[in-house]
């Protein structure tokens, strides 16, 4: 019986490792409100000084780093303010920041992210925006870009600035 448990457990571990390796190479992106793991695409290594191409993009993918080393990815909105790219996280049903958004907890712990815009991957660092004047201005650009969007109010909206 002990030998059967060891063999069965070993097979389970091998299957799990093979599954994770497969996901690592083929990726598993977020879909229809569900989260994903690794993002795939062409990595852009040159600095980006003009993010204006994102104005035509509704949603982007954000891959964050978890404490257990398996990436966590989500889709989110983005906008530009003063030539900088910003990411958006709204707490529509309330909840405490960052506890109700796993990706928010991840980027506060480790701000390195991968952004997928189209088929391109951008490895960047983000910074949580806390300055009220900047938050108000960025929030206004979100409202102008996403005209169908109904804001839950600035107090439940959180923004992250993408650093160069």
Residue locations for each model-derived region?
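Hydrophobic membrane-insertion alpha-helices, especially the h-region
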Residues: 6-24
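Positively charged n-region of N-terminal signal peptides that target proteins for export
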Residues: 1-4
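Generic structural hydrophobic/aromatic packing signal, biased to beta-strands
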Residues: 13, 62, 87, 115, ...
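Short beta-strand segments
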Residues: 57-95, 125
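Short, structured beta-strand-loop surface elements
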Residues: 28, 37, 92-164
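Short, conserved active-site entrance elements at the starts or edges of catalytic domains
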Residues: 24-71
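Generic low-polarity alpha-helical segments
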Residues: 8, 72-76, 155, 160-162
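Charged, low-complexity, helix/coiled-coil-prone segments
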Residues: 19-21, 41-53, 75-89
């Amino acid at each position: 019986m002990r030998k059967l448990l060891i063999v069965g457990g070993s097979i389970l571990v091998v299957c799990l490792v093979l599954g994770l390796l497969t996901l690592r190479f083929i990726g598993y992106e977020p879909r229809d409100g569900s989260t994903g793991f690794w993002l795939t695409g062409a990595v852009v290594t040159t600095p980006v000084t003009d993010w204006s191409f994102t104005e035509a993009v509704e949603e982007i993918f954000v891959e964050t780093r978890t404490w257990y080393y398996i990436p966590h990815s989500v889709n989110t909105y983005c906008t530009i303010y003063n030539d900088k790219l910003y990411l958006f996280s709204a707490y529509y049903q309330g909840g405490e920041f960052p506890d109700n958004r796993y990706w928010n907890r991840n980027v506060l712990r480790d701000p390195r992210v991968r952004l997928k815009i189209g088929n391109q991957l951008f490895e960047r660092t983000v910074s949580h925006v806390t300055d009220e004047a900047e938050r108000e201005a960025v929030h206004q650009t979100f409202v102008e870009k996403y005209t169908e969007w109904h804001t839950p109010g600035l107090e439940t909206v959180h923004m992250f600035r993408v650093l160069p």
